[in-house]
Regions:
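Small beta-barrel nucleic-acid-binding modules, primarily SNase/OB-fold domains
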Residues: 2-182
Length: 182
């Protein structure tokens, strides 16, 4: 019995000293290949939040559409932009309708970044349609969102900034004359 204990202690010490010389296993590597989930969009809650077939709520990373529902954020946005709450909600409906037309009922691939959930327990993701359309980018490109960068989820931040600048200069979506969000 004492001999078995002695052998276990020796193995433990050998493992402890050899550990630094071996690379981590693939699943322990946070910078490994992206992880994906495939599902169907069953509901578009607002312009930047979807619900999947398994009832998972997905907040699209990197973009922020105008608020549709009454909230503290809606009040802050109204104060910041000097726009009436009803105007912001109207812009929010336009963004939601665009997102709904783009992906409602369609099969999607969800890609993750560093953090997988937000403080509201929504799944954070980049969403792609079967044809390869990058939903987050398409919403930004068509002018229905502003860039929202929340580190550490910054994988496509530069792309989103370029798309926002182009949509603004082309006066697309919410940047049309008289409706812009700023």
């Amino acid at each position: 019995m004492v001999r078995v204990k002695y052998i276990q202690i020796i193995i433990l010490f050998i493992g402890f000293f050899l550990y630094p010389f071996f690379p981590p296993l693939p699943f322990a590597n946070s910078e490994g290949p992206a992880q994906y989930i495939f599902s169907y969009v069953t509901r578009v809650i607002d312009g930047d939040t979807l619900e999947l077939a398994d009832r998972t709520r997905v907040r699209l990373i990197g973009i922020d559409t105008p608020e549709l529902h009454f909230s503290r954020k809606l009040l802050r946005d109204s104060e910041r932009s000097k726009k009436d709450i009803a105007v912001i909600q109207s812009l929010g409906r336009r963004a939601r309708d665009f997102t709904r037309k783009l992906c409602m009922g369609k099969k999607v691939r969800l890609e993750f970044d560093i953090e997988k959930t937000d403080r509201y327990n929504r799944t954070l993701g980049y969403v792609y349609l079967e044809d390869g359309t990058f939903v987050n980018a398409k919403i930004m490109e068509e002018g229905y969102a502003q860039v929202l960068t929340v580190p550490p989820n910054v994988k496509y931040a530069e792309l989103f900034l370029r798309l926002q600048d182009r949509a603004r200069s082309d006066k697309r979506g919410l940047w049309q004359r008289g409706t812009h969000m700023n």
